[in-house]
Amino acid sequence: MSDAQKFQLGTIGALSLSVVSSVSIVICNKALISTLGFTFATTLTSWHLLVTFCSLHVALWMKFFEHKPFDPRAVLGFGVLNGISIGLLNLSLGFNSVGFYQMTKLAIIPCTVVLETIFFRKMFSRKIQFSLVILLLGVGIATVTDLQLNMLGSVLSLLAVITTCVAQIMTNTIQKKYKVSSTQLLYQSCPYQAITLFVTGPFLDGLLTNQNVFAFKYTSQVVFFIVLSCLISVSVNFSTFLVIGKTSPVTYQVLGHLKTCLVLAFGYLLLKDAFSWRNILGILVAVIGMVLYSYYCTLETQQKATETSTQLPQMDENEKDPLVSAENGSGLISDNGVQKQDPVWNSNKDFQA
C-alpha cells in the first residue's frame, strides 16, 4: 500500500470516527439535558476535556504516543482560545433564538474561507465555493426558522464565529508548523481548555439557566449519562483534531453539517421528532452540496498530484522531493509550479492578546 493510499485510508477513518462519535454524544447529551434536566453545558464540556486529558495521560504512560513539547505560549494561547470559543458558542445559544444560533454556525464556513484567503493566501476554486453555497443553503433550509435579533446576542455570535474560525485554523496550522500529531497537540492543550471552562463554566451556566450546577440533584441516572458523555467525548475531541489536521478547517465544518443532518434524521426516525417537507428538502440539498464538495476536492487533489509528478523529472537533484520540502516548512509548490513560502502563525505575535 502506497503512502497516498495510507493517508486516504487514515482520512476516511478519521472522518468516520468523527461522525459516529459526534452523533453518539449528541444522542447522549440530548437524554442528559432534555430528559434528565442537566442543562449545564459549559461545565459538562470542562469535564469532557478533563477526562480526555486523563485518558491521553494514560495512553502516554502506556507509550501509545510520544510527548513532544513545543512553544508553551502557542499551547497556552491555543488552549485558552478554544475554551473561550466554546463558552461564546454556548452564550450565543443562550442569548439568541435557535434559528439565529443556526445562522451563526452556518457563518463559520464563509468566515473561515475569508480568513484563510486573506492571511494564508489559500485559493478556493469556483467549484468549491459553489458546492459550499449549495451545502449552506440546504442546512439553512433544514434548520433555520425564526431570526429574532438582539444586540447582545448578535455581538456574542460574532465573537463566537471569529474565535471558532481562528481556533480551527490554528489547529491545522500548529500541527504543520511544529510537526506535532493531533494527539500531541490535544494532550498539551487540553489542560488549558479544561481550566478555562472549569473556572467560567459554573458562572456561564448559572447565567443561562438560573441554576447552580453544584446544587443539582445527581441521581444514578444522571451520573451514568455524565460518565458516558465524558467517555464518548474522548473520541470526539481526538477525532476533531485528527480531521482538521488531516484535511482542513473548512472540511471539518462541512463534516459538522453532515452530522447535523444525521441528527435531524435520527430524531425523526427514532425519536419521532416533528419533521416537515422543508426539513427533508433542506437535508437533500445539503447532501448534494456535500457530495459536490467531496467530488471537487478529490478532483483537485488528483490534478495537483498529477501536476507535481510531471514536474518532478524537470527539477534539479536538490529539488526532487517538494513534498518533503513543504513538510519541512521550506516552501510549497503552487499551481503554476513556482515555489512559494508557506505562511505560518507567528507565535510571538498571534498568541498575544
Swiss-Prot record:
Q: Name one GO molecular function term.
A: UDP-xylose transmembrane transporter activity
- Which ranges are annotated Polar residues under compositional bias? 327-353
Residues where Phosphoserine is found = S334
| Keywords annotated in UniProt | Antiport, Golgi apparatus, Membrane, Phosphoprotein, Sugar transport, Transmembrane, Transmembrane helix, Transport
* One GO CC term, this protein: Golgi membrane
The record describes its membrane topology as: Multi-pass membrane protein
Q: In which tissues is it expressed?
A: Ubiquitous.
User: What sections of the protein cross the membrane?
Assistant: 7-27, 31-51, 75-95, 100-120, 132-152, 154-174, 194-214, 224-244, 250-270, 280-300
Q: Which GO terms describe its biological process?
A: UDP-xylose transmembrane transport
List localization entries: Golgi apparatus membrane
Q: Which domain of life is it from?
A: Eukaryota
In this chain, the stretch annotated as Disordered covers 308-353
Keyword Protein transport attributed:
no
Chief subcellular site? Golgi
- What family does the Swiss-Prot or TrEMBL record give for this protein? Belongs to the TPT transporter family. TPT (TC 2.A.7.9) subfamily.
What does this chain do?
Nucleotide-sugar transporter that transports UDP-xylose and UMP in a strict counter-exchange mode.
User: Which protein are we looking at?
Assistant: UDP-xylose transporter 2
What gene is behind this protein?
A: UXT2
